[in-house]
């Protein structure tokens, strides 16, 4: 059975807060314009508090898991963490969401608007976690 390495819990606490704020800015400023350019509707409704709470909570879980993978990958710089984060985004998040989209859970326009946000968020989180090891 594998043992989990020690990770910097301060970084695991800070990284989700930073990426949550960046995601909020992305969805407020970038995503509506991108969706409009792609021919989709620009959503103007506010996210419910319960949805935001779940989004934040899942980022803490993601940060811990990504921190463990960063230690296992021996990424010791922000650039190394960025690569691990982007790899995780492409290998896991984007593929899962693409599968859900293919089965009718969302549109491909929504997916196209989500891709940059996931790459930014995972990459930034990886960079923070690796730099702050």
Give, region by region, the residue ranges found by the protein language model.
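Juxtamembrane/disordered regions of integral membrane proteins
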Residues: 1-133
